[in-house]
Each structure stands twice: as structure tokens, then as C-alpha cells.
Amino acid sequence: MLQALLIFVLQIIYVPTLTIRTILLVKNQTRSAAGVGLLEGAIYIVSLGIVFQDLSNWMNIVAYVIGFSAGLLLGGYIENKLAIGYITYQVSLLDRCNELVNELRHFGFGVTVFEGEGINSIRYRLDIVAKRSREKELLEIINEIAPKAFMSSYEIRSFKGGYLTKAMKKRALLKKKKDEHAL
């Protein structure tokens, strides 16, 4: 029984660790992923080793499987809370909607406006880049001002230049000055 509990706890730790390592690899943070992978490998070997010691012990096998499943739920929750990386939203509008553009820029979102040809009329597309941790805030602003907008999104692997890079540098400097004044 104690072994089964240990296996369950190890799986609850192992699977979210696996999730985080995978995310770091996808985000091109290979050194961090390698560090997390050390922990992941150690947990995997210990947990599976206990199970393989006695394959007739069904409690250990059930603990492994249920722990794995619970770990997936926890890993997904952690991934959503960490919200590592950036996202781009493409927002299609019937009109230019300067109110939305100005509001998004006011709150620090990078917005580029494009004019295009729709099937029946001119359409406008906003390309908006944001940290994933601010996605909910972004969607609230869009839904408040342009609730009928068509939106699609994708995650960004990397980027260079543009408003967002300048804004990040500016925020970092302001934070540094604020921290220095706090001391």
C-alpha cells in the first residue's frame, strides 16, 4: 500500500514535470528543458522501477495509471497558469473600429491594422501580439468593444523587433528603476 501511494505521488510530480519540459522545448528553451529533464528522468526510473519489481501487484499498476492521469490534469493546469510565451490574434472586423485599436494600444498591446477585400465589402484585420498571460485581458477588451469580431489565434515561437520588443525593454527599465527606489 505504501509503495502504491509513493508511485501515485511520483506520477503526480513526474507528469507535470514532463509537461513543463515539453513546453520549454517547444518554446526553444533547451537548456531549461534539459535541467527539468534530469528531474523527470530520475522520477521516471524510480517510479517505473517500483512497478516492475512486482508486476503481480495490481495496486502499484493502478496507482501508476491513476497517478499518470491525475498528473496530466495537474500539468495542464500548471501550463495554463504559467502561460509561457506569446500569442498572436488576428481579429477581422467589418469596420476599422478605431475605438478598439486605441483601447488595445492604451493597455500596451501591439496592434497592426490591415485593410482587405472581403466577399461583399472592405474588411479590417488587426494583428495583435500579447503575452499568453495577458490573453484573457485581451479577449475581454475585444469582446467588450467588438463582440461580433471573428478571431483566430496562434502561438509565436519567436519574434524580433517591433512595438512589443520596445515596450518590453521600456517596462524592464521602469521596473529596474522602481526596484532601485524601493531599496
From Swiss-Prot:
Keywords: Cell membrane, Membrane, Transmembrane, Transmembrane helix. InterPro entries: DUF2179, DUF5698, UPF0316. It is a multi-pass membrane protein. The chain crosses the membrane at residues 6-26, 32-52, 58-78. It comes from the Bacteria. GO terms for cellular component: plasma membrane. Pfam families: DUF2179 (PF10035), DUF5698 (PF18955). The keyword Membrane applies. It is found in: Cell membrane. HAMAP family: UPF0316. Belongs to the UPF0316 family. This is UPF0316 protein BcerKBAB4_3093. It comes from Bacillus mycoides (strain KBAB4). The lineage of its organism: Bacteria, Bacillati, Bacillota, Bacilli, Bacillales.
